[in-house]
């Protein structure tokens, strides 16, 4: 009996391969090629344009680290925006913070939202929560129209290809600063230091010119290229490394802890060299 294997070609010379039980859905949306597959090792997985976006097995790492680092850094996050993130995982984590009154999700591709609800219910299950406002719209344009509106903005985008290209520009980061309140914080995924070191260097440079507090932190995500993933955080006022212990409270997580919050900012030398 033949086996089906799916390979994501992460660079010209490197990729990740996984055994597939069956294809759940495949579609060319208005913006990208969407695939939902059931894999033997990582459960149901979402691919966009052939790239792993999330899997049932390891999704918690990414979503917890995008959400909880800025939300514990800010003393009272009430209004939060997620740009991208149509799978709903970041929203699920945001709603674990009782201070949050409203979480807005803006994703350009409604099909990602639709099929995440269908095939990734453990990830997308909170998208229908009454505190959540889901908008199928261009995140770049949404930011451009917003001013002094959000406490925290999280950019949960794909890699800088296709519809996400504009989400890695200095103009976009300037728009985020305008959309944030005077003590606002933002975080964005910024890929990995093994295959895209220039991206990290460029994003950090641009964000540092806009936000007085700019830092890089990492997490280990098996299905993402190289397994070592980075996040850039920009803050107008609050330092993520100066959060008092009394501010941390217990939430249900699998990866994020008070100690991980601090340890994530300890970088290997070759990574810290990228942002000097």
UniProtKB/Swiss-Prot annotation:
Assembly, per entry: Homodimer or homotetramer.
> Which biological process, per GO, is one annotated for this protein?
spermidine biosynthetic process
Native organism = Bacillus subtilis (strain 168)
> Which reaction is the catalytic activity of this chain?
S-adenosyl 3-(methylsulfanyl)propylamine + putrescine = S-methyl-5'-thioadenosine + spermidine + H(+)
Q: Which residues form the PABS domain?
A: 3-236
Query: Where in the cell is the protein located?
Result: Cytoplasm
- EC numbers listed for it are 2.5.1.16
Active-site residues, as the UniProt record annotates them: 156
State the protein's name: Polyamine aminopropyltransferase
Which GO terms of the molecular function aspect are on file?
A: spermidine synthase activity
The UniProt record lists the keyword Transmembrane: no
Q: Which pathway, metabolic or otherwise, does it act in?
A: Amine and polyamine biosynthesis; spermidine biosynthesis; spermidine from putrescine: step 1/1
Q: Which family does it belong to?
A: Belongs to the spermidine/spermine synthase family.
> Gene name on record?
speE
Q: What does this protein do?
A: Involved in the cell growth and proliferation. Catalyzes the irreversible transfer of a propylamine group from the amino donor S-adenosylmethioninamine (decarboxy-AdoMet) to putrescine (1,4-diaminobutane) to yield spermidine.
Gene3D superfamilies linked: Spermidine synthase, tetramerisation domain, Vaccinia Virus protein VP39
Q: Which PANTHER family match?
A: SPERMIDINE SYNTHASE, SPERMIDINE/SPERMINE SYNTHASE
Listed binding positions for S-methyl-5'-thioadenosine are 32, 107, 138-139, 163
Q: What class of enzyme is it?
A: transferase
């Amino acid at each position: 009996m033949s086996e089906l294997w799916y390979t994501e070609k992460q660079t010209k010379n490197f990729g990740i391969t996984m055994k597939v039980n069956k294809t759940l859905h495949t579609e060319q949306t208005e913006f990208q090629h969407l695939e939902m597959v059931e894999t033997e090792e990582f459960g149901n997985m979402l691919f966009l344009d052939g790239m792993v976006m999330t899997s049932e097995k390891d999704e918690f790492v990414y979503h917890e680290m995008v959400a909880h680092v800025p939300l514990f850094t800010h003393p009272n996050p009430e209004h939060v925006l997620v740009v991208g993130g149509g799978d709903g995982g970041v929203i699920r984590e945001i709603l674990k913070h009782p201070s949050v009154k409203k979480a807005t999700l803006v994703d350009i591709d409604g099909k990602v939202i639709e099929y995440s609800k269908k095939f990734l219910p453990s990830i997308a299950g909170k998208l229908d929560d009454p505190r959540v406002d889901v908008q199928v719209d261009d995140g770049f344009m949404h930011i451009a129209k917003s001013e002094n509106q959000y406490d925290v903005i999280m950019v949960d985008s794909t890699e800088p290809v296709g519809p996400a290209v504009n989400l890695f520009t200095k103009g976009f980061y300037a728009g985020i600063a305008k959309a944030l309140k005077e003590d606002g914080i933002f975080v964005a995924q910024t890929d990995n230091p093994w295959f895209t070191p220039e991206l990290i260097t460029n994003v950090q440079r641009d964000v540092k010119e806009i936000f007085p507090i700019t830092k890089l932190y990492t997490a280990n995500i098996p299905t993402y290229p190289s397994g070592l993933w980075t996040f850039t955080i920009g803050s107008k006022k609050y330092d993520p490394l100066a959060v008092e212990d009394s501010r941390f409270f217990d939430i249900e997580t699998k990866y994020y802890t008070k100690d991980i919050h601090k340890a994530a900012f300890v970088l290997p030398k070759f990574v810290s060299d990228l942002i000097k």
